[in-house]
């Protein structure tokens, strides 16, 4: 899939976030990357054979105190090649992009992987 098309899928997934949540994402940058770097894989605790579809790097809203401010934006990376590798069709890519964006946005709101499992997000 061309990068521009993939980027539009990510933008559509972000645009579908309800306004009450989107309003709390003013210091979050969402990036499309081909694949994770070695450092990003290490940060996520991902082994060399595992796939990393997305990554949130920053300070979740639940961890911010009154001291928080004047900081670089949190970052959400969405990895195109990783997502394409686990999908068999464009429809699956569309759904996986949506799922991955929402998963990483959930981390921004302080929801960890264990809680996402409990909520049935997987």
Residue ranges of predicted features:
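Short alpha-helical catalytic segment bearing the HExxH-like zincin motif
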Residues: 96-104
């Amino acid at each position: 899939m061309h990068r521009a098309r993939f980027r539009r899928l990510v933008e559509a997934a972000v645009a579908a976030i309800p306004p009450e949540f989107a309003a709390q994402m003013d210091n979050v940058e969402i990036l499309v990357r081909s694949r994770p770097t070695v450092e990003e894989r290490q940060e996520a605790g991902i082994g060399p054979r595992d796939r990393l579809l997305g990554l949130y790097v920053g300070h979740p809203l639940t961890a911010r105190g009154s001291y928080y401010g004047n900081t670089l934006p949190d970052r959400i990376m969405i990895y195109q090649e990783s997502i394409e590798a686990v999908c068999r069709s464009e429809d699956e890519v569309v759904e996986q992009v949506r799922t991955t964006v929402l998963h990483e946005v959930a981390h921004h709101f302080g929801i960890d992987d264990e809680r996402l499992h409990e909520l049935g997000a997987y």
